[in-house]
Amino acid sequence: MDRATIEPAIKLLLNEIHTRLTEATRIAKAAEACALAGSSAEGVSVSMDIEQLIYEADRLQGAAALLNRLSGG
């Protein structure tokens, strides 16, 4: 596949990974704040949203890696 065609797609995928992991970081900080304030159960509840974001970031990473391999990178 043509690298010039794939490059913008890879950049978009990496941006989406960054977006999801930034959101996961925000949620993790909120969960930690709950735990530090004495509410570990609430912290765990808040942190449950992280799982989906990490799953999505992993799938996006797989797609970016595949495109990179297909382009000979």
Residue ranges and their predicted role:
Residues 1-34, 66:
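N-terminal acidic leader/helix
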Residues 30-70:
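Short, charge-rich amphipathic interface segments used for partner binding and complex assembly
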